[in-house]
Amino acid sequence: MFGKLSLEAIPYHEPIVMVTLAMIALGGIAVVGAITYFRKWTYLWSEWLTTVDHKKIGVMYIIVAMVMLLRGFADAIMMRTQLAAATGGSEGYLPPEHYDQIFTAHGVIMIIFMAMPFFTGLMNLAVPLQIGARDVAFPFLNSLSFYLLLAGVLLVNISLGVGEFAKTGWVAYPPLAGIQYSPGVGVDYYIWALQLSGLGTTLTGVNFLVTVMKMRAPGMKLMDMPIFTWTCTWANVLIVASFPILTAALALLTVDRYLDFHIFTNELGGNPMMYVNLFWAWGHPEVYILILPAFGVFSEVTSTFAGKRLFGHHSMIYASGAIAVLGFAVWLHHFFTMGAGASVNTFFGLATMLISIPTGVKLFNWLFTIYQGRLRFTAPIMWTLGFMITFSIGGMTGVLLAVPGADFVLHNSLFVIAHFHNVIIGGAVFGYIAGFAYWFPKAFGFTLNEKWGKAAFWFWISGFYVAFMPLYALGFMGMTRRLNHSDNPLWEPYLYVAVVGAVLILFGIACQLIQLYVSVRDRNQNLDVTGDPWGGRTLEWSTSSPPPFYNFAHMPEKVGLDAWHEAKEAGVAYKPAAKYEAIHMPSNTSTGLFMGLFLTVFGFAFIWHIWWLVGASLVATIAVFVRHAARDDQGYMVPAEEVARIEGERMKALAKAGALPAGARVESFERV
């Protein structure tokens, strides 16, 4: 009845795991207790769990990303301390099979369940506002996408206490990932977590491409869109083009494991290298899916805090497109050692080097934007400046690895690990944190504490260099990745230094948590009354903070480049409307939540071969969707009187803050 599932699946013999599970259980009880005590279940259900508001969905994505950052970093610091402890005659404190699960989970979590939802959250929060839209093209699909991601998150975390996770590394290469060498459920957890979350990501890509193409404000040309919107658009093009490849590769691995096919096996006609090609045909575009939106954040931040129009706006768009296109022509550089031959390696090596050209264009455009600007050293701009230095180093090491001869020496060494973290942490993570600080007041109505934000930055950037620069040296010294023990005394000092760096990053994360607490505590002293705390240039800053659920009382018209800045310069930033009209909005729905819940059960049942539950959960998922489709809900109308009331309250607050243009009267904002 329960397939392969039994009480033996719970790792009672692993004290670290059991203590972690106990802490998670206590934390969960505390959260449920707090929600019950403050009687917030109804509010949580109606305002968040069933919402289709892109802004709230964006916030939920970011919350998931931050929770998974803590989980992924816990894995990272365990790996670093294990490697420092397991030298010479010592075996460290993690058994090899546990360590293997940790480094696999770390990679999967940080890329799929931390970085991706962080980017998606910022995109949900800002893009519709930047293009003057009231919501995304398919609001229900947006909700479903989030709950598909959450299904993958749940499966990854369930594997901690029920069964095991994959021991293959985050790439899950066969034949190691095949049923012969990984007969447990770990690889199955990996497959279904990635399949469900990947489906959600694909739907998000389609949703936002349609949103940008069809729902821009009247008069907003494509070339006038903010750079963050453009980089997200290019990222969504990559998502739609690449994620189906991952879906297909994992589906083929699934039939290998479940139905004894021989697609990626070493015998009976199978070819493991086909999986490697398919994986990286998705995997390298995935790197640019992560980094392009961060480039967009840096563009917005640089322009805003330099007080200047972004230098080379059009060239930024073309450079982003070039990066996206070239990103599909470089995947083989991940396995130059495969034996494809000198001609193939040369082509992919040159293509990899070419990507540095449009990336360099971006870097110089940011520098020229800063040049002669009146730079304000807020936390977002500090993350941006830290990125420029750190990412440049990571990019140069990437160009080195693009040389096939050098790659033959450094392949699978810690040099590659250092390079990858150099560009992902120094690029994507720094960018997302900058974007979080930049758009936080827009989402919540008050600014983050600057002192703690800057402290977090200094701990993060110093910790990064202390943690990962030694790994470059260790790579040159011959230390390979995925070791759980070393016996070379020359490596030990570098491993100890790397632990110190990880601890510094831990302090940085602690500062961010303190920053959140202090900011919420002191929110009344840091309110964003105007909706434009930074002196922004794009449309999202024309709305209140947080924006009303309908975003714009009137759709912006004749929107050009830096539309909000131009409106402020012309003195028409808060021009009163002649009258307000009713607004059509989509209704909340619980369908996405229940589909995500049933698909989580579906994945869990497939992992443990509980076939009756597979069928039941699939039928339930289809039934919930059919019920939703049959309802044909057309949404609802927000009365003009309600719109006028909300806008009137905002204008009174603006008048009190002295932000209204000269001669404007509050009464003029309340016409219906």
Curated annotation (Swiss-Prot):
Its EC number is 7.1.1.3. Fe(II)-heme o binds at residues 288, 411, 419. Heme b binds at residues 106, 170, 421, 481-482. A ubiquinone binds at residues 71, 75, 98. One of its GO terms (cellular component) is plasma membrane. GO terms for molecular function: cytochrome bo3 ubiquinol oxidase activity; cytochrome-c oxidase activity; heme binding; metal ion binding; oxidoreductase activity, acting on diphenols and related substances as donors, oxygen as acceptor. The chain crosses the membrane at residues 15-35, 57-77, 102-122, 136-156, 190-210, 235-255, 278-298, 316-336, 347-367, 381-401, 414-434, 457-477, 494-514, 594-614. It catalyses: 2 a ubiquinol + O2 + n H(+)(in) = 2 a ubiquinone + 2 H2O + n H(+)(out). Residues 36-56, 123-135, 211-234, 299-315, 368-380, 435-456, 515-593 are cytoplasmic. Its cofactor is Cu(2+); heme b; Fe(II)-heme o. There is a cross-link at residues 284-288 (1'-histidyl-3'-tyrosine (His-Tyr)). Keywords: Cell inner membrane, Cell membrane, Copper, Electron transport, Heme, Hydrogen ion transport, Ion transport, Iron, Membrane, Metal-binding, Respiratory chain, Translocase, Transmembrane, Transmembrane helix, Transport. GO terms for biological process: aerobic respiration; electron transport coupled proton transport; respiratory electron transport chain. The cytochrome bo(3) ubiquinol oxidase complex is a heterooctamer of two A chains, two B chains, two C chains and two D chains. Cytochrome bo(3) ubiquinol oxidase is the terminal enzyme in the aerobic respiratory chain. Catalyzes the four-electron reduction of O2 to water, using a ubiquinol as a membrane soluble electron donor for molecular oxygen reduction. Has proton pump activity across the membrane in addition to electron transfer, pumping 2 protons/electron and generating a proton motive force. All the redox centers of this enzyme complex are located within the largest subunit, subunit I. Protons are probably pumped via D- and K- channels found in this subunit. This is Cytochrome bo(3) ubiquinol oxidase subunit 1. The gene is cyoB.
